[in-house]
């Protein structure tokens, strides 16, 4: 059982980013509960790249915390490629500050949240959102973090 991490640092300032071992642990803690083998690219970017991707793929002209790009293998081809996560450093840092959350916990939450999207979970419909948020809470707790939605409900 393994998750292979391809880490890409595409931001100007890499000081204070989660380390490869941290990212690997968060991916393992999320994905290995669903499948035995996977390959995931985590690309940490600045606001300009996040904004461009968010506009291109979601029609939103602003940077966002995490974008998930699931890999869809051609029919009949089985590959362990799960997909790509693109995480915007500045947005994650700003949200952690605004939400009074430890930065490490918010980084972990973005990896968990994005990984669940790669696994096919979504939060468009209320019932899907409840299921996904509960999975996030459970996984974050297993990883040693507080409920990521606690501050959102106050």
From Swiss-Prot:
Cofactor remark: Binds 1 zinc ion.
Enzyme class: hydrolase
Binding site for Zn(2+): 113, 117, 123
GO molecular function: metalloendopeptidase activity; RNA endonuclease activity; zinc ion binding
Listed GO CC annotations: cytoplasm
PROSITE patterns recorded: UPF0054
A GO BP entry: rRNA processing
Enzyme Commission number(s) of this protein: 3.1.-.-
Cofactor entry: Zn(2+)
Record's subcellular location: Cytoplasm
Key words of the record: Cytoplasm, Endonuclease, Hydrolase, Metal-binding, Nuclease, Ribosome biogenesis, rRNA processing, Zinc
Family: Belongs to the endoribonuclease YbeY family.
HAMAP family, alphabetized: Endoribonucl_YbeY
Protein name (record): Endoribonuclease YbeY
